[in-house]
């Protein structure tokens, strides 16, 4: 979807009555009432196998893996056609030497894996990551244990008017800043990184305060779905490449 279509009234965000039925089993209680069920068995098995394979790739010992969870849009009611399957290995970082460096290492492994693989389940990309077992998740965000085959936290339905003028203005505020840097070919890396960090912290503040359906998180998701998060990241990488390249001809 183009940004001008968003301004006219369209949105990339969705809120459903049920979880994604391509992935989840459901036994309706009544018409339009379908509680969160279990993940389809064959999908669960595939994701567990992939998670352990990724752990070997990342050189994470199996004994530090405490659980494997599914979270993100496809474990909630706000999934879209572009939502990932977010598979996280919960690891005991206390059992890792140089645990202060492990976060950067895991992020690097995730990014390298994503650059070289395109794994999909029912048409949805699978993103694998690892996080500390004690790391909190937003209270209203669905979290499903693949190993235990049950919900750790069941997803909740909340309504946010994503077509309101105030919501659109906030998205436009960030879009205008991103476009300003790119259109004016701003080369100030510190300023670019500050904008990236501003957007990241804006989202984190919302997740901590009100969770998955926070105003701030939905603004971020709209920016991401419209392509502006990647647009800013790609521009920053181009500026870095140009800064450190040299041609004497």
Question: Language model features by range: what are they?
Answer:
Residues 10-83, 90-249:
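Catalytic core of pol beta-like nucleotidyltransferases
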Residues 1-10:
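Short acidic, low-complexity intrinsically disordered linear motifs used
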Residues 2, 86-88:
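Generic low-polarity alpha-helical segments
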């Amino acid at each position: 979807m183009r940004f001008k279509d968003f301004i006219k009234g369209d949105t990339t965000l969705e809120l459903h009555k049920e979880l994604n039925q391509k992935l989840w089993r459901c036994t309706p209680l009544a018409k339009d009432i379908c509680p969160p069920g279990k993940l389809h068995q064959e999908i669960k098995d595939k994701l567990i196998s992939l998670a352990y394979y990724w752990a070997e790739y990342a050189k994470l010992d199996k004994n530090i893996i405490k659980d494997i969870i599914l979270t993100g849009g496809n474990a909630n009611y706000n999934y879209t056609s572009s939502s990932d399957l977010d598979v996280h290995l919960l690891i005991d970082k206390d059992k890792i030497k140089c645990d202060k460096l492990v976060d950067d290492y895991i992020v690097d492994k995730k990014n390298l894996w994503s650059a070289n693989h395109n794994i999909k389940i029912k048409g949805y990309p699978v993103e694998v990551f690892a996080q500390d077992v004690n790391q909190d998740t937003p209270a209203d965000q669905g979290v499903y244990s693949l190993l235990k085959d049950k919900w750790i936290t069941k997803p909740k339905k909340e309504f946010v008017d994503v077509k309101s003028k105030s919501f659109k203005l906030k998205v436009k505020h960030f879009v205008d800043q991103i476009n300003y840097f790119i259109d004016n070919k701003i080369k100030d890396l510190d300023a670019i990184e500050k904008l990236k960090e501003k957007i990241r912290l804006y989202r984190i503040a919302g997740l901590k305060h009100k969770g998955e359906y926070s105003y701030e998180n939905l603004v971020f998701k709209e920016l991401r779905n419209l392509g502006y998060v990647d647009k800013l990241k790609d521009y920053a990488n181009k500026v870095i490449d140009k800064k450190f390249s040299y041609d004497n001809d």
